[in-house]
Amino acid sequence: LPYFVKSEHNEALDDQYHGQNGPLNVAQLRHDNPFTRYFVEAGSKHYKTNDDFNGSDQEGVGVYQVTQKNGKRCSAAVAYLNPAKHRKNLTIMTDTVVDKINFKNLTAVSVKCITKNKVNELYAKKEILLCGGAYGSPTILQRSGIGNESFLQSHNIECLLDLKGVGENLQDHIDYITSHRVDSWELFAKPFKSLKFLSLIHI
């Protein structure tokens, strides 16, 4: 959480879960369909509203924030990589896959990676940040010997730390977005035509 707070520049929220001094911009949606407001209003009649899905509570009805700046996508690359890619103390390795992290007394000391079938080992001077995402990070930890001992042993991986939560508690939700161009802000585009169509349906 401290790294998330440090990275974030939230235009609206500033509390223990959010920061306003980082490069990754988080904003409210600039435009929303009127039906969105109708949906939230209807949902709030039967369930609690939530103005911050990245705060202490992730349940409720509301409109979520987006990683945008001035209406454009603000990704980690936009926030961090693009401004720093010309720095002399930064090396960007493409076509590279991290295999595992090497530990000494449970302190991360180096990273084994593969670049175009060539194995490299990169040594840390200060610290190693693992940013492989919901799938990549636990997988790298498991290959490095951190995870459920019985699972690691079944794959002939030496267990350095028996940590049963690694790779076993993925919780996700489906977010399916589809876009269509219509000539009306109404949900059914042309309400009267839709009503005429519905009148032809017999149950």
PLM regions and their residue ranges:
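Conserved redox-cofactor binding core of oxidoreductases
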Residues: 1-108, 177-201
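Glycine-rich loop(s) and the adjacent beta-strand/alpha-helix scaffold that form part
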Residues: 101, 108-198
